[in-house]
Amino acid sequence: MEKSIESISSSTLNILDNKNYKKWDNETVCKWLLNNIKTIQKVSIEIFQANEIIGKDLEFLTDKILLKMGVGIRDILNFKFEYQILKNCYNNNNNNNHITINNFNYNFNNFKININKDLLKVVVNAPIININEYQYIETISKNKFCEIEKYKKSQTKVNEYIIIKKIIKNSTLNEEKLINEIDTIYLLDHPNLIKIIGYCKDKNYFYIGMKYYETFKFKQSNISKFGKNFEQVIRKISFKILSAIDYLHSLEPPIIHGNINAKNILLDNENNEPILIDFGLSYKSIDLLTNQKTQFISPCFITPEYFYKKTKNKISKEADIFSFGSTISNMIKGGTDFKEDEEGFEELKRTFAGVLTSRDKVSFDYRSLFTEINKDEPCFRPSSKELLKSFWFVEPPQPSFKTSEITTNLLIYYLKKYGCYIIRDGVAMVSLNFNENIYSTSSIIGSEFSHQPKINEKHKYFKEINQFYSKILSESFQAKIGWYLLNLNNEFKDKPYFKNIFLSFSTSDKLEINSVADLNLKLTIFFYNSITMSLIYQTIYQKPKSFKIVDYL
């Protein structure tokens, strides 16, 4: 058999000539390449045998390494299966030194491979468990695709429980994909994700063993025992679950959970940690041409894009985020099930609208967070990484100092980091970031102007403009920057010249108005973005102690 055809790149030669074996992680393979410069792009078992290269020496030869060694993408595609075969054969061989080649038949030009399938057993890290060592206790749940059962290890004095997920074998199940999925999840390393112990199979089922965790039911009776601290408890649970979701979404390729709800959050009593369960293993291993993967999505949290746009795909990062936000609200409400139809979807909307209006029960920061998560358009929902930075999750310890210690620099720091919420009657009207230009000019605005702003009282819409201003200030009007709250009603009352500025600009030719609807839109933008923020900046600069430390709830 021919041993060489093409040369490797000059950069690779430099590495090999310098014998920088640590960079390639394997001295044996590098020595072989030094002696056989032209053998990298087509190899055979005989070549590896002749150079005493065994299976474990091949484990580091990933696509990334091969690309660095000068192998082109086309060549990688042509022989990547051959490398996998060689690695699997050596790894599965007891001696790792002897292997037959009678069952291999190569055709590189046509990219055809005929091999003995017995040599291609998938090598996985997840161990094989003996189901006979465990005693069946009870069935926790079941559907037409799988069953979840509780088992106890036999012949032990201590009660050692595990969960067995039995996946039914059928014509649509791709067993190789399922085993790969098991191995992928077995290798996941996050304290808030369920741990796979191992697996086994028989002619009817795949058995997947997982650590047993207690179920914490988010019912109103359980939530109420925390009293006024219930939101903090749920926030801590939610943050840890979100970190697990972010871990899954950050993998390459990402893992989409697809089934986030309170029922899939368990409790590890040993570490008092929430555990996210039931991701993968339910839809990834099923043929994508079937609709079985959708059967595992909880009808509790149908996404708006699925309900309104009738999209067939319920599985996405954005859908996970929507379900996560819905799960938090569902926990706060004490747990509710919803039907997968129009009536159930409308009930879901009413329930979560109730969360947003329960101002005596949930914090403003959560209501603001949920509003962002609950966007109808998936592209407008925050990512898991963005959520982890939100104030509701990462708020610093509540300040222990007095209001007299609030300074301009402190408020500017929080403003730059978290932005400013303009709150009207308990509802966030707008969230604004720090604006250097407005801040630098706000300090000079005041009654000491040499002339008062000119107001055109004969303006066509002067009455409506004046009513707009009065209506806003007739309701509770606040600004929130981190932990600090400013009563805007009082500030506008103390600074009447801001009203004059508002009326002057609104009745000038600078604000082109074509209709009453157009008037309200432009007045709203101008009032919140310019007038209100100017007043806030001036207060930060001149009277920072006007801000008060607000309680969490």
Curated annotation (Swiss-Prot):
Q: Does the keyword ATP-binding apply?
A: yes
Q: Where does ATP bind?
A: I140, S141, K142, N143, K144, F145, C146, E147, I148, K165
Signal peptide location: none
Where the record annotates domain Protein kinase, the positions are 134-393
Say if the entry is tagged with keyword Translocase: no
Question: Mind listing the UniProt keywords for this protein, alphabetically?
Answer: ATP-binding, Nucleotide-binding
InterPro entries assigned to the protein according to its UniProt record, in alphabetical order? Kinase-like_dom_sf, PAK3-like, Prot_kinase_dom, SAM, SAM/pointed_sf
Per its UniProt entry, which superkingdom is the organism in? Eukaryota
Q: Which GO terms describe its molecular function?
A: ATP binding; protein serine/threonine kinase activity
Which ranges carry the SAM domain? 24-90
User: Which one Pfam family would you cite for this protein?
Assistant: Pkinase
Which PROSITE patterns has this protein been placed in? Answer: PROTEIN_KINASE_DOM (PS50011), SAM_DOMAIN (PS50105)
Name the family the entry cites: Belongs to the protein kinase superfamily. Ser/Thr protein kinase family.
* Domain topic, free-text comment: The protein kinase domain is predicted to be catalytically inactive.
What protein does this entry describe?
Probable inactive serine/threonine-protein kinase samkD
